[in-house]
UniProtKB/Swiss-Prot annotation:
Family according to the record: Belongs to the ArnF family.
Membrane topology: Multi-pass membrane protein
Subunit structure: Heterodimer of ArnE and ArnF.
GO cellular component terms listed in the entry, alphabetical order: plasma membrane
Name of the featured protein: Putative 4-amino-4-deoxy-L-arabinose-phosphoundecaprenol flippase subunit ArnF
Metabolic or biological pathway: Bacterial outer membrane biogenesis; lipopolysaccharide biosynthesis
Gene name of this polypeptide: arnF
Protein's job: Translocates 4-amino-4-deoxy-L-arabinose-phosphoundecaprenol (alpha-L-Ara4N-phosphoundecaprenol) from the cytoplasmic to the periplasmic side of the inner membrane.
Subcellular location: Cell inner membrane
Any Gene Ontology biological process: lipopolysaccharide biosynthetic process
Keyword Ligase: no
Organism ancestry: Bacteria, Pseudomonadati, Pseudomonadota, Gammaproteobacteria, Enterobacterales
Presence of the UniProt keyword Cell inner membrane in the record: yes
Organism expressing this protein natively: Salmonella arizonae (strain ATCC BAA-731 / CDC346-86 / RSK2980)
Amino acid sequence: MGVMWGLISVAIASLAQLSLGFSMMRLPSIAHPLAFIAGLGAFTTATLALFAGLAGYLIPVSCWQKTLHSLALSKTYALLSLSYVLVRVVTRSVRRFLSKSDARRIVHCGGDNADFPARQLMMACASTAAIRRRNNIEH
């Protein structure tokens, strides 16, 4: 029963971490506090993802409490590390999926609006790819 609670906690914590990453990529930078607060007040998808991610970190606490009552601490830490692996695998899979899809069609859906998330994501991926190419050439 403890393993089940641990796996539930891992799933919720992983989703929370992905949700927080999603929201932070779309909200204004924290370096500009007034813009960030205004972004929070807009109640966009990014704001909801931020609050869901924060709640997602609180919920697993009760799951871990139930897990620790029935499992040894060494096994519990192994379950906890599974969350980091899961987030990494999902993130890499999404990047590969987006790189194999027709990028022009995704970007075109946003039209000329630079605030469209797909356009921002594609611009970030393109700049990351350019940096990687430049670093490979330099080395």
